């Protein structure tokens, strides 16, 4: 017997990614049940995967990270300190999972939307302001938008329309247009402390906006400045297709 319940598409796709992972990970007789459940859901959800392939990929990646963290926890002889670290990482990934589901539901104007009770987290991102730099750092901004509930991105006025189109699908990415860098300089000694203390934002800066700027292996050094894995540049890069 089965029951049909109304759920948001984000929640349904989340369930499907977990079933995908189970079908990959479970290799005994239990796998048949996972395959049946996955294939049953896939019939109704395939069109949404085709519509939002990037979001589905990221959601599956987050759930795979949670799976692996739990796998390192259950039945393993680990210290209390390590157990606490794993639990903290799982909570962080669960929050990222919630944000990706919320992005999908927003794109579909879903009436059913999951909500969390925690205080919203905000970040401020200040990178180099050339249009090419904006594209190089798209992966970083997209990743941060899964770690924070709002990400403010500095951009030049003359590139505002281009950058708006780059993040048109995600209302949690807010643009902060300026004429040029001098507007928020000196950044490290004045603007950054003000943003952190008065606005309660976590500040991310790279390149010449860091305390001791050093450029190498461009643009990968920018990701090193942000303490983000270099793979994020390509894995999280996404620009939505515009309507014709």
Q: Which role fits each region the language model picked out?
A:
Residues 1-120:
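Anionic, Ser/Thr-rich low-complexity intrinsically disordered regions
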């Amino acid at each position: 017997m089965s029951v049909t319940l109304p759920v948001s598409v984000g929640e349904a796709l989340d369930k499907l990614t977990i079933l995908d992972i189970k079908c990959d990970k479970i290799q005994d007789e239990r796998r048949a049940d996972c395959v049946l459940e996955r294939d049953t859901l896939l019939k109704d959800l395939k069109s949404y995967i085709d519509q939002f392939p990037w979001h589905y990929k990221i959601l599956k990646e987050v759930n795979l990270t949670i799976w692996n963290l739990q796998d390192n926890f259950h039945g393993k002889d680990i210290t209390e300190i390590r157990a606490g670290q794993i639990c903290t990482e799982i909570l962080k990934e669960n929050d990222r999972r919630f944000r990706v589901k919320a992005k999908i539901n927003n794109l579909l104007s879903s009436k059913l939307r999951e909500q969390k009770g925690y205080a919203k987290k905000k970040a401020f991102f200040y990178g180099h302001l050339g249009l090419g730099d904006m594209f190089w750092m798209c992966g970083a901004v997209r990743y941060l938008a899964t770690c924070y509930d709002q990400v403010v991105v500095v951009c030049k006025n003359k590139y505002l329309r281009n950058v708006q189109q780059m993040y048109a699908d995600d209302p949690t990415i807010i643009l902060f247009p300026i004429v040029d860098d001098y507007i928020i300089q000196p950044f490290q000694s004045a603007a950054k402390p003000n943003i952190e203390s008065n606005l309660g934002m976590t500040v991310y800066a790279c390149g010449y906006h860091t305390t001791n700027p050093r450029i190498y292996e461009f643009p990968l050094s920018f990701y090193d400045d942000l303490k983000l894995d270099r793979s994020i540049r390509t894995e999280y890069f996404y620009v939505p297709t515009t309507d014709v």
